[in-house]
Amino acid sequence: MADNGTITVEELKQLLEQWNLVIGFIFLAWIMLLQFAYSNRNRFLYIIKLVFLWLLWPVTLACFVLAAVYRINWVTGGIAIAMACIVGLMWLSYFVASFRLFARTRSMWSFNPETNILLNVPLRGTILTRPLMESELVIGAVIIRGHLRMAGHSLGRCDIKDLPKEITVATSRTLSYYKLGASQRVGTDSGFAAYNRYRIGNYKLNTDHSGSNDNIALLVQ
């Protein structure tokens, strides 16, 4: 190490040689999370990705706070304070939107840091909730050998005659209704159907299924 406390090029080279294997594993894990960690592909990797995203917020905020406390000069200190405020406001807005979505859907998927759009499908006496990346005008449902897939998510066994008449897509501000449109059976246990959006408003899910299965939303006063 040099007299002024910095490391030399040779020392940096030796450090990289010693940590190359660890760095390679870190980049491999990052690649796997970015390429394969999707909710409709690998649920285990997706949960790890969500935990990683949750941890990034407090770690990032702590870095900017420490940079402000142990500032190099007043310019970097001011930048660190500004960035800490921005990150804090972004983190707060995430919690506000998540709790609003949770109040609407009562699903823990509301705290997903990747998206605040949730698909809600009433099936077999309960509401199955899955995350969506965007809200579409038409949502397709495909049944292959008795297994239902909707918007890329596997929802379990279902016959085409048992498809719900209505599904919803919830955000922190709105709830969109989708009505079952055209459907077609293929063979004995396969088929496909399309749900068309026909209404959008400030609603919340009705989790009481003692009545009709079609009544799955209540107006938020």
Curated annotation (Swiss-Prot):
- Residues on the Virion surface side? 1-18, 71-78
Q: What is this protein called?
A: Membrane protein
* Organism of origin: Bat coronavirus HKU3
A Pfam family (short name) is CoV_M
What does the function comment of this entry state? Component of the viral envelope that plays a central role in virus morphogenesis and assembly via its interactions with other viral proteins.
Q: State any single GO MF term.
A: structural constituent of virion
- Entry's family note: Belongs to the betacoronaviruses M protein family.
Q: Name one GO cellular component term.
A: membrane
Could you list which ranges are Intravirion topological domains? Answer: 40-49, 100-221
Q: How does it assemble?
A: Homomultimer. Interacts with envelope E protein in the budding compartment of the host cell, which is located between endoplasmic reticulum and the Golgi complex. Forms a complex with HE and S proteins. Interacts with nucleocapsid N protein. This interaction probably participates in RNA packaging into the virus.
Its membrane topology, per UniProt?
Answer: Multi-pass membrane protein
| Localization (cell) | Virion membrane; Host Golgi apparatus membrane
User: What CDD domains does UniProt report for this protein, alphabetically?
Assistant: SARS-like-CoV_M
Where does the sequence pass through the membrane?
19-39, 50-70, 79-99
The entry's other comment says:
Bat coronavirus HKU3 is highly similar to SARS-CoV (SARS-like).
UniProt xrefs under InterPro entries? M_CoV (IPR002574), M_SARS-like-CoV (IPR044361)
